[in-house]
Protein backbone atom coordinates (compact mmCIF):
# COMPACT_ATOMS: atom_id res chain seq x y z
CA UNK A 1 0.00 0.00 0.00
CA UNK A 2 1.07 3.61 -0.44
CA UNK A 3 1.34 6.54 1.98
CA UNK A 4 -1.78 8.12 0.44
CA UNK A 5 -4.09 5.27 1.45
CA UNK A 6 -5.62 4.13 4.72
CA UNK A 7 -6.80 0.54 5.09
CA UNK A 8 -10.29 0.21 6.54
CA UNK A 9 -12.08 -2.98 7.47
CA UNK A 10 -15.78 -3.67 7.05
CA UNK A 11 -17.16 -5.88 9.79
CA UNK A 12 -20.47 -6.68 11.39
CA UNK A 13 -21.11 -4.40 14.37
CA UNK A 14 -23.51 -6.25 16.65
CA UNK A 15 -24.23 -3.15 18.75
CA UNK A 16 -25.83 -1.32 15.82
CA UNK A 17 -26.93 -4.42 13.84
CA UNK A 18 -25.18 -3.49 10.58
CA UNK A 19 -21.85 -3.61 8.81
CA UNK A 20 -19.49 -0.76 9.68
CA UNK A 21 -16.29 0.58 8.18
CA UNK A 22 -13.53 1.26 10.67
CA UNK A 23 -9.85 1.20 11.34
CA UNK A 24 -7.96 -1.91 12.34
CA UNK A 25 -8.23 -2.27 16.10
CA UNK A 26 -7.80 -4.78 18.90
CA UNK A 27 -6.50 -5.31 22.38
CA UNK A 28 -2.90 -5.29 23.53
CA UNK A 29 -1.97 -8.75 24.77
CA UNK A 30 0.09 -9.21 27.94
CA UNK A 31 3.73 -8.41 27.24
CA UNK A 32 3.05 -6.55 23.98
CA UNK A 33 3.86 -2.94 23.23
CA UNK A 34 1.30 -0.82 21.37
CA UNK A 35 3.48 -1.16 18.25
CA UNK A 36 3.61 -4.96 18.49
CA UNK A 37 -0.14 -5.19 19.07
CA UNK A 38 -0.84 -2.88 16.12
CA UNK A 39 1.35 -4.98 13.81
CA UNK A 40 -0.33 -8.21 14.96
CA UNK A 41 -3.85 -6.80 14.58
CA UNK A 42 -2.98 -5.43 11.13
CA UNK A 43 -1.86 -8.92 10.08
CA UNK A 44 -4.98 -10.55 11.56
CA UNK A 45 -7.57 -8.09 10.26
CA UNK A 46 -6.11 -6.71 7.02
CA UNK A 47 -3.51 -9.26 5.93
CA UNK A 48 -0.55 -6.85 6.10
CA UNK A 49 2.43 -6.33 8.37
CA UNK A 50 4.19 -3.01 8.86
CA UNK A 51 7.91 -2.34 8.75
CA UNK A 52 7.34 1.01 10.45
CA UNK A 53 4.82 1.95 13.13
CA UNK A 54 4.64 5.42 14.65
CA UNK A 55 2.72 5.86 17.91
CA UNK A 56 0.90 9.19 17.74
CA UNK A 57 -0.85 9.27 21.12
CA UNK A 58 -3.26 7.56 23.48
CA UNK A 59 -6.99 8.29 23.39
CA UNK A 60 -9.47 7.84 26.23
CA UNK A 61 -13.19 7.30 25.80
CA UNK A 62 -14.51 8.57 29.11
CA UNK A 63 -11.59 9.48 31.38
CA UNK A 64 -13.81 10.60 34.28
CA UNK A 65 -14.97 7.03 34.90
CA UNK A 66 -13.03 4.60 32.65
CA UNK A 67 -9.30 3.90 32.64
CA UNK A 68 -9.31 2.31 29.16
CA UNK A 69 -6.89 3.78 26.62
CA UNK A 70 -6.71 3.28 22.86
CA UNK A 71 -3.35 3.82 21.18
CA UNK A 72 -3.36 5.68 17.89
CA UNK A 73 -0.65 4.50 15.50
CA UNK A 74 0.25 5.00 11.86
CA UNK A 75 1.53 1.86 10.14
CA UNK A 76 3.68 2.36 7.05
CA UNK A 77 5.81 0.39 4.62
CA UNK A 78 3.31 -2.47 4.53
CA UNK A 79 3.93 -5.97 3.21
CA UNK A 80 1.50 -8.88 2.76
CA UNK A 81 1.30 -11.22 5.75
CA UNK A 82 -1.77 -12.78 7.33
CA UNK A 83 -2.18 -14.20 10.82
CA UNK A 84 -5.30 -16.04 11.97
CA UNK A 85 -7.56 -13.72 13.94
CA UNK A 86 -10.43 -14.09 16.37
CA UNK A 87 -13.15 -12.51 14.23
CA UNK A 88 -16.23 -14.70 13.64
CA UNK A 89 -16.13 -13.95 9.90
CA UNK A 90 -13.52 -12.72 7.43
CA UNK A 91 -13.24 -8.96 7.32
CA UNK A 92 -13.39 -7.04 4.06
CA UNK A 93 -10.41 -4.71 3.55
CA UNK A 94 -11.38 -1.38 1.98
CA UNK A 95 -8.51 0.88 0.83
CA UNK A 96 -9.45 4.56 1.13
CA UNK A 97 -7.50 7.51 -0.30
CA UNK A 98 -6.48 10.11 2.29
CA UNK A 99 -7.66 12.92 0.02
CA UNK A 100 -11.21 11.51 0.41
CA UNK A 101 -11.23 11.47 4.25
CA UNK A 102 -13.85 14.21 4.49
CA UNK A 103 -16.24 12.05 2.46
CA UNK A 104 -15.47 9.02 4.65
CA UNK A 105 -16.12 10.90 7.89
CA UNK A 106 -19.65 11.77 6.71
CA UNK A 107 -20.64 8.20 5.82
CA UNK A 108 -23.36 6.65 7.95
CA UNK A 109 -21.47 3.34 8.10
CA UNK A 110 -18.32 5.01 9.52
CA UNK A 111 -19.60 6.01 12.94
CA UNK A 112 -17.20 4.68 15.56
CA UNK A 113 -15.90 7.62 17.61
CA UNK A 114 -12.35 6.30 18.05
CA UNK A 115 -11.93 5.86 14.30
CA UNK A 116 -13.27 9.35 13.60
CA UNK A 117 -10.96 10.96 16.16
CA UNK A 118 -8.00 8.91 14.96
CA UNK A 119 -8.42 10.08 11.38
CA UNK A 120 -8.50 13.76 12.39
CA UNK A 121 -5.34 13.33 14.46
CA UNK A 122 -3.54 11.23 11.83
CA UNK A 123 -4.44 13.68 9.07
CA UNK A 124 -2.85 16.56 11.01
CA UNK A 125 0.21 14.45 11.86
CA UNK A 126 0.67 13.54 8.20
CA UNK A 127 0.29 17.19 7.13
CA UNK A 128 3.10 18.19 9.48
CA UNK A 129 5.37 15.58 7.93
CA UNK A 130 4.98 16.85 4.35
Regions flagged by a language model, labelled:
Residues 1-23:
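N-terminal strand-loop-strand
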Residues 17, 61, 122-123:
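Short secondary-structure boundary/hinge segments and terminal tails
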Residues 26-117:
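Unchanged
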Residues 118-130:
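Charged phosphate-binding loop/patch that engages nucleotide di/tri-phosphates or the phosphate backbone
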